[in-house]
Amino acid sequence: MDAAQLKADIVLLIDLITEHSRKVELVTHEDLQDEFLSKAPLQQPIPVSQIKAEYEAIPEMERKLRNKADDSPEEKERRRLISRRQMFGSLFSGELSLADLKEEPAEAESAPREITPEYFETVLAEVLKGQYGIEDLTSWDSKHYYHFSPLLSASYARLLSTQNNPYEQILDTVRESSRVYPRPVGVFTFEFAPFRIDPTVIQ
C-alpha cells in the first residue's frame, strides 16, 4: 500500500466527516462509505509543498480568530484549524521535518483508482486509531455514526443520534445531566431548541 496515497485518503475521510459536523449533523457508516467511494478514486497524494504551506499558515489564521464566544462560527473554525494542524503534524511528521524542500515535479493526472469497501474500512480504522478529532458512537437503535469533536461535542452528538426518538432523547439528556453536573432537568426544557419536542409527547 502506497503510504503517501493512504495519508491523502485519511485526510479526505477526515474532511468528509468534518463537513458534516460543520453542518451540525452526524454521518452514518453507510453514508460515509458511499461518499468516500465516490470521491476517493480521484484523490491524489498531497504534495509536500502544499502540506508545509498549509501547516505553516494555520498559526496566523488561528491567532486572528481568538477571543470569540465559544459557540461562535469563528471559535469553531479556530478549533478546526488547531485540530487540522495537529493532524498534519502527526500524519506528515516525516515530510514536515525535511530541512530543505526542493521543487516537486508536476505529476501527470492518473486514471481514477478502484476503491473497494474493504479499503474504506482500512482507511477508517487508521482515522479512528489516530488522534485526529474523529469520534464514533452507536445510537439507541444500533446505528453507527461519526463526528468531528472540535466542532460537534460527544454530548451533542448523542443528542442528535436520538432525534428520531423523543423518549430516548429525554432519557439520555436527563442521564447525561445527572452524570456531568449533577442537576435536574426542567421538563419544559424539552419544548425548546435543540429538542423542540411536542408538549403532549413530553407529558
Summary of predicted features, one role per range:
Residues M1-Q203:
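C-terminal non-catalytic scaffold/interaction domains in large multidomain proteins
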